[in-house]
Regions:
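Terminal targeting signals and extreme-terminal segments of soluble enzymes
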Residues: 1-189
């Protein structure tokens, strides 16, 4: 398995309690923990708590206040609401000291083929090799972002739609790790 980014290597500190490290350097220079990092750490802590192989089907989080990189690691408390053979649901609370940062609900399901396949058609846009490289990888180091509508991400026709391609160069054996990577990057795109 490829090396996970340090921020996704949550460490168990006691039963149901995890510690999520912050980056060594503040990527944006604002001393504010990025929301995608907290979502990704919630996924990793929740996944580490389930006893059988499950994948995240959904995560919903409310952010109460900003965390600070200078305040130390994000502390994650995972409470199991239900844990069955096929489904599990967890409440994950992210704090720094006595400060509530976020509370999330994570729904997990056994890894199985999706029998319901419906989605809108992919847009007819140029592929990543014909798109301009973007600078949106600042919050998520190592990510490659390609902006279909040009270097600034604004659509040529002035419409509110922007298209981009996102790729992280590593792939992980863990479904949760791959989901965490996308969850980490998505709020910043």
């Amino acid at each position: 398995m490829s090396q996970l980014p340090d921020e996704l290597q949550v460490k168990e500190v006691s039963s149901g309690h995890w510690s999520g490290p912050n980056p060594a350097d503040d990527p944006e220079g604002r001393d504010v923990v990025f929301s995608g990092q907290i979502l990704a750490q919630m996924i990793m802590a929740s996944d580490a708590t389930v006893e059988s192989q499950k994948e995240v089907k959904s995560i919903h989080a409310i952010f109460a206040r900003a965390g600070r990189y200078s305040a130390g690691p994000v502390e994650l408390a995972v409470e199991s609401m239900h844990s069955g053979r096929a489904w599990a649901s967890h409440t994950v609370t992210a704090t720094q000291g006595d400060r509530l940062l976020s509370r999330g609900l994570v729904l997990l399901n056994t890894v199985e083929p999706d029998l319901m396949r419906h989605a809108p058609a992919m847009p007819d846009v140029p592929g990543p090799d014909k798109s301009a490289e973007g600078t949106l990888g600042v919050v998520f180091p190592g990510a490659e972002v390609r902006l279909v509508n040009g270097g600034d991400g604004v659509a040529d026709d002035g419409s509110p739609a922007s298209y981009l391609w996102f790729r992280y160069p590593e792939s992980f054996d863990s479904v949760a790790a791959n989901q965490a990577i996308v969850s980490w990057a998505q709020p910043g795109l």
